[in-house]
């Protein structure tokens, strides 16, 4: 809708198990996806458990590359995505600007860059949040936060009905970036119109899964948003 044309070639940076890449090729037989990640073991798992479950014709339209996202050389893409906050591993302006410039160069002339970010007053706390699901409880643990540098270390734990636990199933160390910082860095890297998409609310005041452009946002305790930037 932003560009008034269909996109067919997507690159998923920090792709991990390539979930977004696989979903992209499912949506249209003309779609192709490239996934880039530096971790070979995670890519292997994705090949077996994500790509391997696609129809054979769809499998051929997903390519996984083991590489640092700043070094990889791919054909120009319509869309480049960096989700799950993984790009926050770049913990200085110099590193983040370098990545954004590389992302800008990797896009076609009318390409779009998508990333996500989270914030709110609770993002600056050392805390745990539990969410119950069928068969397990998901625990998001903000174990360490440094106000001076915005360094943070987080874990994901799982608890099960039989009393067993899987502690530190995932651990992340990154910088907590803010929305204005990301928008300014994107513009400095050459992107145009970096726009934050904010989630709407249902009648109970909870997120409704619908995101729309917003230039102010709400002072919520915790929020997740998307940023879209144009080349």
Task: Give, region by region, the residue ranges found by the protein language model.
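Conserved class I S-adenosyl-L-methionine
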Residues: 6-16
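Conserved SAM-binding loop of SAM-dependent methyltransferases across substrates and taxa
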Residues: 17-30
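Conserved SAM-binding loop
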Residues: 46-47
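Conserved SAM-binding strand-loop segment of SAM-dependent methyltransferases
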Residues: 54-69
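A short acidic, Gly/Pro-enriched loop at the edge of an enzyme's catalytic core
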Residues: 70-80
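A short glycine-rich, Lys/Arg-flanked "PGG" loop and its adjoining helix->strand segment in the class I
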Residues: 96-109
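SAM-dependent methyltransferase
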Residues: 114-185
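C-terminal lobe and adjacent flexible extensions of AdoMet/dcAdoMet transferase-like proteins
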Residues: 176-231
